[in-house]
Amino acid sequence: QMVKSVYETKKRFDFIDMNFIGSIQARNDKIAGKLFDIYMTEYQRLNPKWSREELKPFVDKLVKEHIDKIKPASNTMAQSVFVEHPTDGLSLAASYVGGISINENYGSDYKSFTEIKENEVRIGHKPVGCGNVKATIDHELGHQIANKLNACNDTEIVEKYNRFSGLSDIEQANTLSTYAAKNIGEFVAECWSEYSNNPQCRNVAAFVSKRLIDLYEAEEIGPKILERGFSR
């Protein structure tokens, strides 16, 4: 399902650059390796008389402090990483593993993962048609698309989100999902997830997703989209 999700999205948005697809834990290991190289180089520059072995404990400690900050929470099932302009060591290291990741604590048990997502759909926490692994990946890809297009600052999408966030929980569930009200980034990602998985996609998800397509076509940052809407 992960391959299917990425393939369909790449077919629509060719600019999506997936440097990493895998578990959050494996991604963090790669970030740790990059961080070590970055900070070791800097420490050696600042302390030319110190050997690599002498500096290693200090670098290891700094790397651990950074990695501890990005460990997935117990309820985190998936994450998206997108760093276009690194501003520090951590974001520079993360820029090498831009893409999507699944928490291996959930991804290692497909049946349990699916049951959790189906229940989230049932209670309105997630959109209709999104009770599966593919929809979770599509949600994370929605973040990638939105970040690349700066969609969260688009006037039409902001207006749609502001109206949505003013709805009651029940109205939000019937319109899209309650999770979509968390912030505009999650709102856009939830819209893309439903658009990619619900053959009877509802109005808000359809509007926002088609707006993403319009923004992409206007940017001319890649081949034009050949198809719209739900596809199997």
Task: Describe the residue ranges of each PLM region.
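Active-site-flanking segments in enzyme catalytic domains
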Residues: 1-231
